[in-house]
Amino acid sequence: MNNKLLVIARVIIFISIGLWFFTHNQNASLQEIDLESVNNKKPDIIITSVYDNYRVDSDLKTAWGFSCLIETPAERILFDTGGSSDILLFNLEKMNIDPRSIQKIVLSHIHGDHVGGLNGFLEQNNQVTVYIPHTFPSSIREMIINHHAKIHEISEPMKISDFVYSTGELPGPPNEQSLLIDSQKGAVLITGCAHPGIVNIVLKAKDIIKKETIYLALGGFHQPPLSVVKELRKIGVKKVAPSHCTGDSVREIFAEEYQEDFIEFGVGQVIKIEKNSTSRLRF
């Protein structure tokens, strides 16, 4: 009888310890994606298009692909690297952006027009942390490691930097992560190609930030059905800056629907988001 009680006691202790670890790990994971406290002053954000098949400055080079630079008071983050390091580095130099001033790279998905510039960039600056979706092939990991850069694999939503978050890896194909920025004016969503569907990504972003609206959705929208234009309005996207793979005809419909809330985005475009204004500059 005593032996049975001892066994039962041990089982109860084991289960209790297991539950404690499970709860502790769950809380730790959630803390990673908690938005900054409302008491913290949200920073001004600058987003610059450095690689795209659209452009607003004829002095810059254009090619199929996407890359933009996000600047906060804390860091410079490169989102995707376009398809060619030669073009990426040319545009950065033209815009007086030193590759060595960039601390982090976030890659949205595996397609060459988004990761093709990585190798050449790392030859210029390997003092970066590269954030990749968990399902990326080993060849990309090996490239990053061979350049002695840091690597961080992402599957779930997580904090990248102060006020900057990954949506986590969303199912495609291919699987893809997007960036979410908590700015002075509200949430800014940046997509590489939106293979999981731009509406799905917006809904995921809203779930992460626990807000009803997205201030600005920017990037490649993967030529969605025309009905998506009105649907984004309906689910709370206030401004749009579609580029890259969105498609000319869809961009035109976005421009008609959003009017002054449509932002032309292409190489050379700079969007500065401040508390009292959102300005558009060009190099």
What kind of region is each of these model predictions?
Residues L5-A74, E156-E169:
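Zn-dependent metallo-beta-lactamase
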Residues M95, N126, N146-H147, I235-G236, ...:
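Short, structured coil segments at secondary-structure junctions
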Residues K4-R10, N25-L35, C245, S249-F283:
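C-terminal regulatory/interaction regions
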Residues D86-Y131, K206-L216, R233:
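Active-site metal-binding motif and surrounding structural segment of the metallo-beta-lactamase
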Residues G117, A187, C193-E274:
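Cap/insert and terminal regions of metallo-dependent hydrolase folds
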Residues I132-Q177, S183-Q184, I263-R282:
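Metallo-beta-lactamase
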Residues L78-T81, Q103-I110, Y131-H134, L189-C193, ...:
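Active-site neighborhood of phospho(di)ester-bond hydrolases with catalytic His/Asp-centered motifs
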Residues T48-K94, E176-T191:
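Conserved beta-strand hairpin/beta-sheet module of binuclear metal-dependent hydrolase folds
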